[in-house]
Amino acid sequence: MVVYDLLVSLSKESIDVLRFVEANLAAFNQQYIFFNIQRKNSITTPLLITPQQEKISQIVDFLMDEYNKNNRRPSGPPREQPMHPLLPYQQSSDEQPMMPYQQPPGDDDQPYEQIYHKKHASQQVNTELSDYYQHILALGDEDKVMDSMLKLPEKAKRDDSDDEDSMFPIKKLTT
């Protein structure tokens, strides 16, 4: 914690105060924010803050002020140079300069990698497609076997005179 680093540079009593603040920070934090909001809005109603919490708020204010004083950037135009100047890269005499990639000799205009990847990809697609079609054909064979096992006896052919109307006689209304 930044506050802890500040207190280490102060006295032993300050470290004890910080330990107390850390121990009670969760319970204190919400009320301290509420206290600051009301103080900034200049509301004069009495607040439910114990004297101990008031001391803690004063300590935290003091510590934050000290931290801001110590870590304030100097005023003025922004720095244009980095803190640590960059050293120019010097190539030693032992190192060889990097050579550009040279294409292996071949009849094709395309680089070797592109040709390899195209061939490899087309072979992979072909094998995947053939596996897929083999699977579909196998499923078709299974369906034929299942159809033959579940084949139902054919229904006896009905005469043309055997209508569904005769099964369910309905009186026709005549007007």
Swiss-Prot record:
Alphabetic keyword roster: Late protein, Virion
Composition bias, Low complexity: 94-105
GO cellular component entries: virion component
Location (main, coarse): virion
Keyword Transmembrane helix: no
Induction (UniProt): Expressed in the late phase of the viral replicative cycle.
Subcellular location, record wording: Virion
Region (Disordered): 68-112, 153-175
Family, per entry: Belongs to the asfivirus H171R family.
Protein name per its UniProtKB record: Uncharacterized protein H171R
Biological source species: African swine fever virus (isolate Tick/Malawi/Lil 20-1/1983)
